[in-house]
Regions:
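Conserved beta-propeller blade repeats
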Residues: 1, 9, 101-119, 141-161, ...
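Extended, small/polar residue-biased N-terminal targeting/export presequences
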Residues: 231-281, 343-369
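PDZ/PDZ-like domain segments forming the peptide/carboxylate-binding groove
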Residues: 266-319, 392, 515-516
Length: 538
């Protein structure tokens, strides 16, 4: 596959791919490029030639046949010499097989080389099996929900792993599909499973940790020491804690273990407001309403100072936990009885939101407040953006703001505080390090300059102790390249790439920091604190 033709996400977060064929034989290349009609005529001519040879051979005696066989063997040897792979011109014998770039999975070309089967993400986000007729240049979906595929040895059937782990056999000649029934029973012994995972973790760290000396830790000693607690552990959460304890002895970032618990049956929804905990009396006194939240809508009729007395007819008792009244209510109409600040009681219908949506709204409010502060103190001359994560979505957001709304500002504040990382340092550096070299001016009117897709004016980067991973790497890059000043609190050194490995128990995963970054002096950035140019704790 190649990413030559497809779209690329910022920060190496994935690219669309295509399947490309390279012919290492000139004759095979010519045959592949034949049209459907030309291929049919060639097959017919080959069939006629074989029939003619068969008739000729049947009319000769065995002696002549032996001579013929010897001659055929000689010709076969000559033919094998002719079929040596031709690498020299390989790059000129390449062709893009797929007609649309997408996120690719498995792929397989049939024996005749005229049909390509591949799995790719469809417009709805579903992994789908496609078949492309290379002679007719037509692509059609075959089956949705296909996670992986493999052809049998003869190339007559495809075996498909479908959504949910099912197995399907598809005959390529007829196109028929039939489920493959199978059983894979096993006896699970959780204690033995944990023993295995623990030993596996010890080996993996010893083999893959970025520092061959394991930060000077006596790993064998700690492995024996913590093993004594295994017999006393009876659940995944405690086991993950044990793994985290021993991995913590490495004094490294990007490690520890996680236990993925099942989702709660009934998630507690939220009304999207902050309440006055010091308020006397029953109900919830609203201190502020979250913008774009359920209570901010005009028909909700809720304002700071109002008191929510009941939810779906259930009274809110002073000091009591009201969360049970909102269990499973996200996105569903809820009735609120409200006492307005003037003493009048009203009833409103609202749709509570999920905790995740509440966090997003709170984040947006924080960013908007920061924007207002910077705009106010600078008189509109300085812009402000916050990089939420070192990922493609965050990059697109700040790219639009920096080169859109703030294009005419004199400077930009790039806030990376509380960023959990990702992989975006080079994209940020390119965006913020533009050097203006030409202006465009028809008839004396300025209309723009190059580079148009980079910020060419001053910038400053805000950081804090909460910057992690590539949110350490990005300020390091920014500071090392001299793009601008770093302002804020020192950042712990955590610019290291991690491999989170899922275990045979799918509820358990642990991390191994495999690749650290070295500064220009060859020192690991792991555990190397970054000091801002101007230290301000906030």
């Amino acid at each position: 596959t190649t990413s030559k033709y497809g779209m690329k996400k910022p920060g190496s977060w994935g690219t669309q791919q295509d399947i490309v064929l390279m012919a290492l034989d000139g004759e095979a290349w010519d045959n592949f490029l034949m049209t459907e009609e030309e291929a049919g005529l060639a097959e017919e001519a080959e069939k006629v030639e074989k029939e003619k040879e068969s008739k000729d051979n049947n009319g000769k005696d065995s002696k002549k046949k032996d001579k013929k066989k010897g001659k055929a063997d000689s010709e076969k040897k000559e033919s094998s010499k002719k079929n040596d792979l031709e690498f020299a011109d390989g790059r000129y014998r390449q062709i893009r097989l797929t007609d649309v770039s997408t996120l690719m999975g498995d792929y397989w070309l049939n024996k005749k080389g005229d049909k390509l089967y591949y799995t790719a993400v469809d417009p709805t986000g579903e992994m789908t099996l496609y078949m492309e007729d290379l002679k007719k240049n037509e692509t059609s979906p075959v089956m949705s929900g296909v996670q992986a595929m493999e052809a049998d040895a003869a190339g007559d059937n495809l075996f498909l792993i479908t959504r949910g782990g099912g197995l399907t056999k598809m005959n390529l000649a007829s196109g028929t599909k039939e489920p493959v029934a199978f059983e894979a029973d096993y006896d699970r012994k959780p204690s033995a499973e944990r023993e295995y995972i623990y030993s596996h973790m010890l080996r993996q760290v010893n083999d893959k940790f970025y520092d061959v000396n394991l930060h000077g830790v006596d790993w064998e000693y700690y492995g024996d020491h913590y093993r004594q607690f295994l017999p006393h552990i009876g659940n995944d959460r405690d086991f993950a804690d044990l793994l985290s304890e021993i991995l913590g002895e490495l004094n490294a970032s990007h490690t520890g273990a996680k236990c993925f618990a099942g989702d709660a049956e009934l998630e507690v929804a939220d009304l999207g407001a902050y309440f006055d905990d010091s308020s006397d009396g029953a109900g919830l006194k609203v201190s502020s309403v979250m913008p774009r939240g359920p209570l901010s809508r005009r028909n909700a009729n809720v304002a700071p100072g109002d008191i929510i007395l009941a939810i779906d007819g259930k009274e809110i008792v002073k000091g009591a936990d009201y969360s049970s009244m909102l269990e499973g209510k996200a996105g569903r109409p809820v009735s609120l009885r409200i006492r307005k600040a003037d003493g009048k009681e009203v009833t409103s219908k609202v749709k509570p939101i999920t905790p995740g949506r509440l966090r997003q709204l709170a984040y947006e409010r924080w960013v908007e407040n920061n924007e207002r502060v910077v705009d106010s103190v600078s008189g509109g001359k300085i812009g402000y953006v916050h990089v939420k994560g070192m990922d493609g979505d965050s990059f697109r957001t700040i790219y639009e703001r920096i080169l859109g709304k703030y294009r005419n500002c004199d400077a930009i504040v790039v806030d990376t505080r509380y960023n959990g990382g990702g992989w975006l340092h080079n994209d940020l550096a390119i965006l913020l390090s533009g050097k203006e070299y030409v202006n465009f001016s028809p008839r004396g009117q300025f209309i723009g300059h190059e580079p148009f897709s980079q910020w060419t004016k001053p910038s400053v980067m805000l950081v804090c102790e909460g910057n992690y991973s590539d949110a350490h790497g990005s300020p390091y890059t920014y500071q090392t390249l001299g793009i601008g000043d770093i302002v804020g609190a020192p950042i712990p050194g955590t610019m290291t790439a991690v491999w989170w490995e899922n275990q045979i128990n799918p509820m358990i995963t642990f991390g191994i920091p495999q690749v650290t970054s070295l500064d220009l002096n060859g020192r690991p950035l792991e555990n190397q604190q970054l000091n801002p140019d101007l230290i301000i704790y906030n």
